[in-house]
């Protein structure tokens, strides 16, 4: 992506009349003023060349020795100093053309230089993007943001946000800002709390998401809402999750069914990919996979569909097996899983030892496998299986000579997740297409799950989702068989968002919570304001909230979320540039009626 793309407007004043990256042979012989940063400086045989950089790109400036005062001033320039240049645009000679930059056919012969800000020595170079520690980059983020890659990431993010707004406005969505100071909720992640000066002992919370507000907007009669919403969660950092603050495309629609929302989202992602990226969508409409199916086939509810491996259920092959480990896991709630890896049956022992080590890290007791070689099946499992079982396995999986089959056995969910982890581990054997976007919807999540620790039925995901079958399902079906109108959208193994068709009926909500062990009084005390709103006329509604940061990561091929955020925190939730979090004065604490009590370990620090 060129920095210059879309930059056509120029304010003409004493600092500049044009942008560096937009100059071309059409303005040859014209006088221009440019302002920017000294990107590079070279002295070639009496001529000084300056690469001047602004937001749009780079333009080469030539200072000729005949201009003695100008030449002397140019000699004193430091890298990253801010200067303004006045000069004339000329064509470069054919041998001097630089095809790597948009302005590479021209250069500007300087007639005047003014130094607006002379730069001191830099903590790290901008022009040569050498490896620099993340700590230093975050401390001097304003320097880091001058570097091409991250600068372009931030420009891309801005344009993506604008494209999202245009698309949704064309679909009759209304952008509405919801409160930043709201009430704390015990559910979900930890809140960031803000003490109230006017109400001693009480606290606001920064919103983890505008969930309740957007549902109340549906009750208010707004048919389609969206917001590029800041969200705050006091949680640990990961490569794809920023601690503290993140942004999501928050959406909600009234009078819709699940398929309506899918159509809107698929259209938007298709539009954004086609107009802003060279990537391509693997399958459209996006495939829809039930939670049960996605766990059985991929071992995760966030599958990377580019990985050419699938998990197979082979439980039925071992119902009468003499191999007790497999036979014992054919009972209800357990399973035997197999994964065929083509062409890897002749790998070294080290290959299998490393795989087994990874399986143990995932929680398995080991990793059983069978190598299908020219001289017959080999491996630690072969002696325990009959010829009939091996033949049935070959036929079911389509095994050929040179292949290997890995196995897992145990409780269903744990076995699925271990095999899914091994599927991801073996993905390194393949070259995945980085330009392919393998979207999918994961649907039909279970409404409830059994809590082994508390020996009770619990909600498995979102308690405010509408159960499939509504009240009839709650009254007539075993709780663990009830499905919810909940869905995730996943791309290349990254969950972009969860969403749901909401439960807007108080009678169904009370019943759903009753099954999970909550009384009507419990529900009213926790969610009374929502229940009251739903009693006063609530339409059917549903929504979703894709993470903006993660979407930019995918489209820009970034592995670290901090590469797509202008001013991120580090992994310890610290802003190294601004020095936050920081201590506050005793006066500020007294105004808020607060007293700080540090943990003993922290008090001991000098």
Swiss-Prot record:
PROSITE patterns from the UniProt entry: AA_TRNA_LIGASE_II
Signal peptide: none
This protein's UniProt keywords: Aminoacyl-tRNA synthetase, ATP-binding, Cytoplasm, Ligase, Nucleotide-binding, Protein biosynthesis
Residues noted as binding L-aspartate in the record, renumbered to the chain: 187, 233, 461, 502
CDD domains: AspRS_core, EcAspRS_like_N
Annotated positions binding ATP: 233-235, 495, 547-550
Subunit annotation: Homodimer.
Protein name listed in UniProt: Aspartate--tRNA(Asp/Asn) ligase
């Amino acid at each position: 992506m060129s920095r210059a793309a879309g930059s056509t407007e120029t304010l003409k004043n004493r600092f500049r009349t044009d942008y560096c990256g937009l100059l071309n042979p059409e303005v040859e012989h014209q006088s221009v003023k440019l302002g920017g940063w000294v990107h590079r400086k070279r002295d070639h045989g009496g001529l000084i060349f300056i690469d001047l950089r602004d937001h749009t790109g780079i333009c080469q400036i030539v200072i000729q020795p005949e201009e003695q005062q100008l030449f002397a001033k140019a000699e004193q320039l430091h890298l990253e100093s801010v200067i303004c240049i006045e000069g004339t645009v000329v064509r470069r000679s054919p041998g001097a053309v630089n095809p790597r930059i948009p302005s590479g056919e021209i250069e500007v012969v300087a007639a005047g230089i003014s130094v607006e800000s002379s730069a001191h020595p830099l903590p790290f170079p901008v022009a040569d993007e050498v490896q620099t520690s993340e700590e230093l980059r975050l401390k001097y983020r304003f320097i880091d943001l001058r570097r091409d890659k991250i600068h372009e990431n931030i420009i891309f993010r801005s344009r993506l946000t604008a494209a999202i707004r245009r698309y949704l406005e064309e679909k009759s969505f209304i952008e509405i800002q919801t409160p930043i100071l709201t009430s704390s909720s015990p559910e979900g992640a930890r809140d960031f709390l803000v003490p109230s000066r006017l109400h001693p002992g009480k606290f606001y919370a920064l919103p983890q998401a505008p969930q309740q507000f957007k549902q109340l907007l549906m009750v208010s009669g707004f048919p389609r809402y969206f917001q590029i919403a800041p969200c705050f969660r006091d949680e640990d950092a990961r490569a794809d999750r920023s601690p503290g603050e993140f942004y999501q495309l928050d959406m909600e629609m009234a009078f819709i069914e699940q398929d309506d929302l899918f159509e809107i989202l698929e259209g938007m992602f298709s539009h954004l990919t086609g107009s802003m990226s060279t990537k391509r969508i693997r399958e459209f409409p996006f495939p829809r996979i039930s939670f049960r199916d996605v766990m059985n086939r991929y071992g995760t509810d966030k599958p990377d569909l580019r990985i050419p491996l699938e998990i197979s259920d082979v439980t039925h092959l071992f119902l009468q097996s003499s191999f007790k480990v497999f036979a014992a896991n054919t009972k209800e709630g357990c399973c035997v899983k197999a994964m065929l890896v083509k062409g890897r049956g002749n790998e070294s022992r080290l290959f299998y030892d490393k795989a087994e080590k990874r399986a143990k890290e995932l929680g398995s007791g080991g990793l059983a496998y069978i190598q299908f070689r020219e001289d017959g099946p080999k491996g630690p499992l072969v002696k325990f299986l009959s010829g009939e079982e091996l033949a049935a396995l070959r036929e079911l999986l389509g095994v050929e000579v040179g292949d290997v089959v890995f196995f897992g056995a145990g409780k269903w969910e744990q076995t699925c997740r271990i095999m899914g982890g091994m599927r991801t581990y073996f993905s390194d054997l393949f070259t995945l297409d980085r330009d392919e976007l393998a979207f999918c919807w994961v649907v039909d999540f279970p409404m409830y799950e059994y809590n082994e620790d508390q020996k009770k039925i619990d909600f498995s995901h979102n308690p405010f989702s509408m159960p499939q079958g509504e009240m009839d399902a709650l009254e007539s079906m075993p709780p663990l068989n009830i499905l919810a109108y909940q869905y995730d959208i996943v791309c290349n193994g990254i969950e972009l968002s969860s969403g749901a068709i909401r439960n807007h009926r108080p009678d169904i909500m009370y019943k759903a919570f009753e099954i999970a062990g909550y009384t009507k009084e419990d529900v009213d005390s926790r969610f009374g304001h929502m229940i009251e709103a739903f009693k006063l006329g609530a339409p059917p509604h549903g929504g979703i909230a894709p993470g903006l940061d993660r979407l930019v990561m995918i489209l820009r091929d970034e592995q670290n979320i901090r590469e797509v955020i202008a001013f991120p925190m580090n992994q310890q939730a610290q802003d190294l540039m601004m020095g936050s979090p920081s201590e506050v004065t005793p006066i500020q604490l007294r105004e808020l009626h607060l007293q700080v009590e540090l943990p003993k370990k922290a008090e001991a620090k000098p």
